[in-house]
């Protein structure tokens, strides 16, 4: 489904486009479906013409997602792609029994996260890669955003401009073969050669992106690192630890963004940085 905007009559020189990639699967997690419904509406109804979005979801949610997309009146473009969890390439590479083992060692399972959460989190780069392969919008830059990352209600911005209406600005997404990602907590000196990160968070995996070369490089590094975690029987259900391994061993491909806590939730600071 596409909700395509009209071409502007005062376009100047052509420039590239950014495809925003996200996914939603109604699985047991820390938050219930009604909470996600609010967050999904917060995001999809506030993005404008700059936003060309690809949304992966389960077959039973395609109609719901298309209905939300149709309510956007700011000129954003959407493509909803049906894909069952059992079709994930991640499961072809790492069978379900490996994720059952991962759940048994999860230090935070009590918060409500599940095997399905692990599969979705560790498939983010596979979703982006699939969107790049289809290249629906002819983009040379791609960014990932968690579907539940726009948590402030729309009316909270009623007295100021809607920052998301211009999200993402092409020129604000890195074009130097680096991946933009938020650094939540600096790495200690002794962590710079660390291979396995456990139950620590340094990077926000909720949002990241860059040009296609940067994404391809991160894709390669991420799944090599995930191999190390899983083959070593180390917990890797949460993608943020695997991203840390990639970062400390390949710092040259990351553009680490220091968030300003005055600009909202630091986990989702790239909404501000890219707008």
Predicted regions and their residues:
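Short beta-strand-to-loop element that shapes/binds the nucleotide-sugar donor at the catalytic cleft/hinge
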Residues: 177-191
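Active-site-proximal specificity loops/subdomain of glycosyltransferases
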Residues: 74-134
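Non-transmembrane, aqueous-exposed alpha-helical and coiled segments at domain scale
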Residues: 126, 182-186, 243
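Short, aromatic/basic amphipathic alpha-helical patches
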Residues: 62-76, 94-96, 247
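GT-A fold catalytic core of metal-dependent nucleotide-sugar glycosyltransferases
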Residues: 116, 121-178
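N-proximal low-complexity "stem/linker" segments adjacent to membrane-targeting elements
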Residues: 1-35
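Catalytic core and acceptor-binding pocket of nucleotide-sugar-dependent glycosyltransferases
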Residues: 149-151, 155, 187, 194-275
């Amino acid at each position: 489904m596409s909700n395509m905007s009209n071409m502007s009559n005062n376009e100047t020189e052509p420039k590239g486009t950014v495809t925003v990639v996200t996914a939603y699967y109604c699985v047991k997690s820390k938050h219930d479906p009604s909470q996600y419904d609010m967050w999904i509406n917060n995001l999809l109804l506030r993005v404008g013409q700059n936003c060309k979005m690809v949304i992966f979801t389960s077959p039973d949610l395609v109609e719901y997602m298309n209905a939300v997309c149709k309510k956007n009146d700011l000129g954003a473009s959407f493509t909803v792609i049906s894909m069952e969890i059992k079709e994930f390439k991640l499961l072809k590479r790492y069978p379900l029994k490996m994720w059952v083992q991962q759940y048994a060692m999860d230090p935070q399972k009590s918060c409500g996260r599940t095997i399905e959460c692990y599969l979705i989190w560790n498939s983010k780069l596979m979703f982006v890669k699939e969107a790049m392969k289809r290249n629906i919008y002819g983009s040379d830059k791609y960014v990932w955003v968690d579907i539940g990352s726009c948590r402030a209600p729309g009316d909270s911005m009623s007295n100021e401009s809607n920052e998301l209406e211009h999200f993402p600005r092409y020129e604000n997404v890195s074009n130097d073969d680096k991946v933009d990602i938020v650094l939540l907590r600096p790495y200690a000196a002794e962590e710079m050669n660390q291979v396995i990160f456990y139950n620590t968070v340094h990077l926000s995996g909720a949002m990241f992106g860059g040009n296609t070369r940067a994404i391809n490089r991160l894709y390669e590094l991420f799944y090599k690192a995930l191999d190390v975690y899983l083959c070593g029987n180390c917990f890797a259900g949460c993608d943020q630890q695997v991203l840390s391994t990639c970062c400390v061993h390949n710092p040259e491909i990351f553009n680490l963004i220091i968030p300003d806590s005055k600009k909202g939730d630091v986990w989702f600071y790239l909404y501000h940085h890219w707008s």
